[in-house]
Amino acid sequence: SSLDFNDFLIMPPAYYKYGDKEVIEFYSRIIEARPDSRIILYNFEKLCGYKFSIECVKELVKKFPKQIVGVKDSSYNLYEHLKIDNFSVLPGSESKLLKGLELGCAGIITATCNVSAGLSRKVYDDFIEKKEQTANEMLCNVRNTFEKFNLISGLHSFLSDGDKIYKNVLPPISLLNEKDKQKLIEELNKLNFTLGSLKAA
């Protein structure tokens, strides 16, 4: 609270086995400590070992309608089916953006939006304005290219050619080896997706 933050993206604890009851209690404790918080749930089973059920999300929203305001869905079991008024559903991949918008999702939250934000925004704006989709294929191709490698390592390696600060990573994160880095850049170049194109956008 000393930093004056109210909005949070919070994943359930990792490394422990638990169910919906314990997850609800976990978020309840946070909200009791910070009643003015606004929380986006982070649904990412591969990282924490727990996958939100629709029932659990609905129970949390029912219990805390002002505090539980959305979910980042990186397990992709919610975004096609979860419908709650005044609640944002945000898939965790650019490849799910257009389909998610068609289903009523609010947008996306993704790591690769650090480089794909311009394309993602165009897909979003064209959907809202009912224009022809001209950027979605490239957006998905860029995302799929990064996914062929360790995604976070790939992002840092790609961006480090423009700013060496991106080489500064803490274990267990590491940069791609030189062979994989060059392969990533070559595949992105084939899509006409370069650091130069990002700066121009």
Name the predicted role of every residue range.
Residues 164-198:
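Flexible C-terminal active-site loop/helix
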Residues 1-49, 57, 198-199:
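Active-site beta->alpha loop and helix N-cap motifs at the rims of alpha/beta catalytic domains
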Residues 34, 124-128, 143, 159-166, ...:
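Structural signal for hydrophobic packing residues in well-ordered secondary-structure cores
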Residues 133-136, 156, 185:
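Conserved positions within tetratricopeptide repeat
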Residues 2-4, 64, 86, 104, ...:
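Glycine-centered loop/turn motif at secondary-structure junctions
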Residues 31-37, 44-149:
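Catalytic alpha/beta core domains of metabolic enzymes, predominantly
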Residues 22, 134, 176:
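Soluble or luminal CAZymes and related metallo-dependent hydrolases
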Residues 101-102, 138-174:
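Conserved short secondary-structure transition element at the edge of the structured enzyme core
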